Amino acid sequence: MVYEMRKCRRMAMHQVMRVDGKTAVLTNISMNGVLVTSRWLPANREVSVNMTVNQQEFELDGVIQWVRRQSASQKYHEMGILFPNTPELFTETLGEMLSRA
């Protein structure tokens, strides 16, 4: 039996975004953060994230919580990025989007 340990609802997405000014792909999002796939790894745990949520542009401060390589044959990495502090507009916009999902 599999138990869901996450406390926040999340939504699968496939959207291009920027992490520290470099291209990455957003694969899922929750109120706490995002799951991102990229070909590169940031130099620091603290990153700047630029993304669009429900046609609104946001620049957020994030902290990389974990990194995993998808496959030895591919040069893609998955990163879990936590958003410790988000603007109220981001929280409201994402909350509306998640409630409709």
Residue ranges and their predicted role:
Residues V34-S38, Q70-F83:
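Short, solvent-exposed secondary-structure boundary/capping segments
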